[in-house]
From Swiss-Prot:
Organism of provenance: Prochlorococcus marinus (strain NATL1A)
Subcellular locations according to the entry: Cytoplasm
PANTHER family per record: UREASE ACCESSORY PROTEIN D
Alphabetical keyword list: Chaperone, Cytoplasm, Nickel insertion
UniProt keyword Zinc-finger, yes or no: no
Name the record gives this protein: Urease accessory protein UreD
Complex and partners: UreD, UreF and UreG form a complex that acts as a GTP-hydrolysis-dependent molecular chaperone, activating the urease apoprotein by helping to assemble the nickel containing metallocenter of UreC. The UreE protein probably delivers the nickel.
GN (gene name): ureD
Homology family: Belongs to the UreD family.
Length: 307
C-alpha cells in the first residue's frame, strides 16, 4: 500500500492596486496548495509592504517516496519572503531491504520565476535529516536583471542530541539560477552538493560536523562591484563571537556564504546579519524576525550586528 505524499504549493505574488497608505504599495498573494503543504496566515503589514508567507508541512515530516513541488511566480515590483512554519524532519528511508538496499528518496522541487524589479527571499527553517534519510532538493530560479533573490539552506545531519549521525543517509542539493539578456537565457549561478559517506568525515567536507548551511544572494545588476567588495568585508566581520567555520566569497553578481559546525543558532545568526547587510546596501527596511521563527533568539543583540 503506497503512502507517499505528492504535495504542491503554487504562489503568485503581485503588488496591490489598493492600499490605505499611499506611500506604501503592498504585495499580495494568491495560493493553491495540495496536502501536505499549506499556506498559513499571510502578513503584509511591513513598512515596505513586503509579503510574509509561512508554508506549513502538515504531515509533520518527510519520508522516502514523498514528493513536494513549490512554484512561485513573483510579478513585477513584488517583494516577499517565504519560510517554513517549523523545522522540517526527513525520516529514515522507507523500503530499505536486501532487494532494495538503496531505499526510497524524498524529493523537493522549487521553481521560482522572479520578474522585473522584484525582491524575493526564500528562508526556510532548519531541515533535520534523520539517520538513513534520503533527501534531494532541486531549485530552479529565473531571475530578471533588475531583480534580487536571496536563499538560505540550513541542514542538520542526524539528531545530534540523541548522539545520532546520518549513517547511510544522503542530503543532496541543486541550485540553478538563470538570467535573461540580449543573447537569451544564461547561467547566473549553479551549485550542486551531496553530503554523505566520506564527505561527512573528510577535512575537505564536514569533518564530522553535523550542521551545514549556505546563503546565496544574487543582486540586481545595478549593484556596483565596489559595493559588493565592501559588503564581503562586512560579512566576514559579522562572524565574530559565533561558533563554527564560516566562509564568504564574491560571485559575479552577488555573494555566497557557507557554514559548517555544530550550532544551527550560530549559522542562523550569521546568515541573519548578512541578510541585514544586503538590505542596508539597497537602502531597504531592516529585516524582522518572522512571527513563526524562534522568538527567544535575537541576533541583533550582538554589538557587531547592524541595527
Amino acid at each position: 500500500m503506497k503512502s507517499q505524499w505528492h504535495g504542491t504549493c503554487d504562489l503568485r505574488l503581485f503588488k496591490s492596486s489598493r492600499s490605505n497608505n499611499k506611500d506604501v504599495v503592498k504585495t499580495i498573494h494568491q495560493a493553491k496548495c495540495t496536502a501536505p503543504l499549506k499556506v498559513m496566515r499571510v502578513f503584509n503589514d511591513k513598512k515596505d509592504g513586503r509579503c510574509e508567507i509561512p508554508i506549513l508541512h502538515s504531515a509533520g515530516g518527510i519520508v522516502g517516496g514523498d514528493q513536494l513541488t513549490i512554484n512561485v511566480n513573483a510579478e513585477e515590483d513584488s517583494i516577499a519572503i517565504c519560510s517554513s512554519v517549523a523545522a522540517q524532519k526527513v525520516y529514515g528511508s522507507r523500503g530499505r531491504s536486501k532487494l532494495n538496499p538503496q531505499g526510497s528518496w524524498a524529493n523537493q522541487k522549487c521553481f521560482f520565476q522572479i520578474k522585473k524589479n522584484s525582491d524575493f527571499e526564500w528562508i526556510p527553517q532548519e531541515l533535520i535529516v534523520y539517520q538513513g534519510g534520503l533527501f534531494e532538493q532541486n531549485m530552479t530560479v529565473n531571475l530578471d536583471l533588475s531583480s534580487s533573490f536571496l536563499c538560505v539552506d540550513l541542514v542538520r545531519l542526524g539528531r545530534t542530541a540523541a548522539e545520532e549521525q546520518l549513517g547511510n543517509g544522503v542530503w543532496r542539493s541543486s541550485l540553478e539560477i538563470f538570467r535573461d539578456n540580449n543573447q537569451g537565457k544564461h547561467y547566473e549561478f549553479s551549485d550542486r552538493l551531496e553530503l554523505s559517506g566520506e564527505a561527512l568525515k573528510s577535512i575537505h567536507g564536514l569533518e564530522q560536523k553535523p550542521v551545514f548551511g549556505s546563503l546565496t544572494w544574487i543582486t540586481p545588476k545595478k549593484i556596483k562591484q565596489k559595493d559588493l567588495s565592501d559588503l564581503l568585508v562586512e560579512c566576514r566581520e559579522q562572524r565574530a563571537g559565533l561558533e563554527g567555520f564560516m566562509t564568504c566569497s564574491l560571485l559575479e553578481n552577488g555573494i555566497s556564504a557557507r557554514y559548517t559546525g555544530s550550532s544551527t543558532q550560530s549559522a542562523r545568526f550569521w546568515f541573519y546579519r548578512i541578510w541585514s547587510l544586503t538590505r542596508i546596501l539597497r537602502k531597504l527596511s531592516m529585516p524582522e524576525y518572522m512571527r513563526i521563527w524562534p522568538m527567544q533568539e535575537n541576533p541583533s543583540r550582538d554589538k557587531k550586528c547592524p541595527s
